[in-house]
């Protein structure tokens, strides 16, 4: 091997290894101190991109979980108010049944009506004041709202909260009354016992309710028979002996058309639209009609509560799934991004030894040109 003065190849090689060991040592110390295997793109460009996408998705999942929890809170608030609405309407129904009893005087019915009116006011107060974060929930202002329960676009669920005001369409229905009064001797005639009720449902389809009454039945028995044949309408008799028919507003897109011999005899005609807000239980007929109206209203409220309960369960399952996805993504990101301390500590010790060895060898290599002096001496 040649002995040179201008170029110390051994020193250059030792210096290169020393620089490499120092760089690797610095990288190990950076990874150990930060806890991350990838601290810049130069460490692992592809891994950095994947890790960033995973972190973005996890962040979105965290927001989605909060959104779903907010949705559950809104539905719990609304459902709690609806529970009280049901309790109040049940009390109003009890009062209506009490008023329909013949043992009550007009004074007593008037007193019962006063409580019904007060309860109606409370129902509307609940509908107007129930809110979440400033948003009214039960007066119709909430309408349909989307809840983003996923980490990507298009993963939203629409929830609709309908009005619980007592003057709403769903809180009542159409009332019909016979123009003719049935006295105590009135009976269904054998050859004039057919009653057909035709109406258009919410789907735009024509429906018919065919009643073939039993001949010999009086007006009260006729009402009972109609109620036993269909759940689409409710029949009752007022204090004047007139047949009353009630159909829920949400079941029809229009009014009922009556036909048949029995319908002609009774002279069925539209009385008007009755809702919870205009109940009048000061008469037997009004009290009977109030029961039908309240049954319709409670059925509507119960259906809304059932829907909210279903959505709450759905959101809970969505949260469970989001948490599971987040857990798996976090594990994947950890494998890509996080430092393996056992491996990196070993690497650091290795580079420290190499650094020390390279430093020693470099010091010795720097003495090699001095051999030329011995040749000159």
From Swiss-Prot:
Assembly description: Heteromer of multiple flagellin subunits including FlaA, FlaB/D, FlaC, FlaE and FlaF.
UniProt xrefs under Pfam families: Flagellin_C, Flagellin_IN, Flagellin_N
Family per record: Belongs to the bacterial flagellin family.
Subcellular location: Secreted; Bacterial flagellum
GO molecular function, a single term: structural molecule activity
One Gene Ontology cellular component: bacterial-type flagellum
Annotated coiled-coil segments of the chain: 98-131, 302-339
The entry's keywords: Bacterial flagellum, Coiled coil, Secreted
Protein name: Polar flagellin F
Described function: Flagellin is the subunit protein which polymerizes to form the filaments of bacterial flagella.
Lineage: superkingdom: Bacteria
Chief place of localization: secreted
Other known facts: V.parahaemolyticus possesses two flagellar systems: a single polar flagellum propels the bacterium in liquid (swimming), while multiple lateral (peritrichous) flagella move the bacterium over surfaces (swarming). The polar flagellum is synthesized constitutively but lateral flagella are produced only under conditions in which the polar flagellum is not functional.
